[in-house]
Amino acid sequence: MSPAVALTAELIRRPSVSPEDKGCLDVIGERLAKLKFNNERIDFAPVANLWAKHGTGHPVLCFAGHTDVVPSGPREEWQTDPFEPVIRNGIMYGRGAADMKSGLAAMTIAAERFIAKHPDHKGTLAFLLTSDEEGPSVDGTRRVMQVLEARPEKIDWCVVGEPSSGEKLGDTVKIGRRGSLSGKLTVHGIQGHVAYPHLADNPVHLLAPALAELATREWDKGNSFFQPTTFQVSNLSAGTGAPNVIPGELKARFNIRFSTEQSVEKMQATITEILDRHKVNYTLEWFVSGLPFFTAPGPLSDATQQAVKEFTGLTATLSTTGGTSDGRFIAPTGASVVELGVLNATIHKVNECVRMADVDTLVQMYERMMELLLT
């Protein structure tokens, strides 16, 4: 078993369901300390955070990731114990195997190999790790970046070890992410008897025309790097359960994944205009979980593509698809951000797994990126 695979297994054994870390940062921190990293814990209980640096000055190349995992789900649906790594036919099974304890192991072993060869590298090699990525994402990377900005400490390049690959390791590199705007909508009507609709005001009927317009609206056409903006209703509830009662209230949750063609203010104004025009009586709460970001071609994306090409033979597709990541908290500070990791086919699923060969290849790619950017 290679060092990276062994470390992946050691981390999987720690049931770090968000926001718990279960000692994962201690394991990684001890290895980094042996390399003479300056380790700083920036915890906001119960969230654990590690900011570790080797070297001084700029450029600062940061590897970022999270130790927390989503719950395993029903144990009986797993072929193996989700927190006891099992290897079958070159594949390791366990919660967090792909998302993203293999990524953490790969970047740690890559750092060990790189520093052994280049102890006096230029600039700074840094790690930013948290146990609050799968949860609210309030006291993790978001808060650590606030601390660093206040000092000020600036990251130049950041590699997020999220599982970015689709069919083959390295086939996809994320160079940005769409923004995420959510709304919590309450439509106020008047409850009544279904036989006397003139004495009531049905909130479902009030919202329906506006919702139809929102659901079919073309927000934009996207651009060469971003898909078009999308609007989706995620939750909708109204009524008492009785067949003869007009509901007095409707609650809805919706989400917009938006490109760089949009702004939060513009979308909020559009939605309120549509609701007002349809004379909907409502209250609306907004939640912005991240703004869109995009890393333009440059040293980081070049190094990433070169490393992928050298060790896989693939020309990586540069993509901004998928959900949000902690890159959304790092990019606004001016850092260039990419995401490169193992396959994402089984993340958040039962029987989550990772190919052991991919973990070792990821180590090689990460080490090569360190060489290209810090030597």
Regions found by a protein language model. Name each.
Residues 59-62, 91, 126, 156-158, ...:
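Structural motif
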Residues 72-87, 155, 159, 176-186, ...:
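Acidic-glycine-rich active-site phosphate/pyrophosphate-binding loop
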Residues 14, 18-19, 133-135, 240-241, ...:
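Short, small-residue-enriched loops and turns at beta-alpha junctions
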Residues 1-95, 115-122:
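Acidic/His- and Gly-rich active-site-bordering loop/insert found
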Residues 98, 102-213, 351-361:
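Fold-level recognition of mixed alpha/beta catalytic cores in primary-metabolism enzymes, strongest
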Residues 40, 124-128, 283:
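A structural signal for isolated positions on well-ordered beta-strands in alpha/beta enzyme cores
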Residues 163-168, 175, 181-375:
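Metal-dependent amide/peptide-bond hydrolase catalytic core
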